[in-house]
């Protein structure tokens, strides 16, 4: 991913189909995120949302070096291994990959999933202390922003979450 040594990597993805509301919420934090020296965002938008995210962000070349926008990540294992923090939906495959690589995460379950199974999935990591859960309805509010900035500001907390994920 061409991430500079020592950078803090925020990985954002919505699963194989992407997640428009999640993309909107992360894009709304552009100025706040890019104001953090050493932060690199790797943002997998889903194919349907790539143009929307690129247009919404309107990144300069300098900003684009720190905010990598792509429709899909073919080597998710490599991306998760590089990530200091993950923001993701909570589909079964996403949870399995996040857990396998012990990546600290903020999980935003898709609210219309059958029988709310993504919330159930998320609790696997949340209950272990390896993730935070932010309901989709709270993406536009202070809880998502404060959860994200709080974890970016606390490397010790992320390290504890990583250890919790390892069991």
Predicted features and spans:
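A donor-sugar binding/catalytic signature common to diverse glycosyltransferases
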Residues: 76-118
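Donor-nucleotide binding loops and adjacent catalytic segments primarily
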Residues: 3-88, 119-123, 127, 134-144
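Hydrophobic "lid"/C-terminal helical patch
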Residues: 148
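A short, well-ordered alpha-helix in the C-terminal region of glycosyltransferases
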Residues: 157-167
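A short helix/loop element that forms part of the nucleotide-sugar donor recognition site in Leloir-type
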Residues: 1-2, 157
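Residue-level detector of anion-binding/catalytic polar loops
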Residues: 104, 130-131
């Amino acid at each position: 991913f061409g991430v500079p040594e020592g950078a803090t990597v925020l990985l954002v993805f919505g699963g194989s189909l992407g997640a428009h509301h999640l993309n909107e919420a992360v894009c709304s934090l552009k100025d706040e995120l890019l104001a953090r020296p050493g932060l690199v965002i790797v943002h997998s938008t889903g194919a349907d949302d790539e143009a929307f995210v690129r247009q919404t962000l309107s990144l300069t070349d300098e900003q684009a070096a720190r905010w990598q926008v792509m429709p899909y990540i073919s080597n998710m294992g490599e991306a998760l291994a590089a990530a200091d923090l993950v923001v993701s939906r909570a589909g079964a495959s996403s949870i399995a990959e996040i857990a396998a690589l012990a990546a600290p995460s903020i999980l935003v379950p898709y609210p219309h999933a059958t029988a709310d199974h993504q919330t159930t999935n998320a609790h696997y990591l949340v209950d272990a202390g390896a993730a935070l859960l932010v309901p989709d309805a709270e993406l536009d509010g202070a809880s998502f922003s404060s959860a994200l900035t709080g974890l970016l500001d606390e490397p010790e907390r992320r390290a504890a979450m990583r250890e919790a994920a390892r069991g």
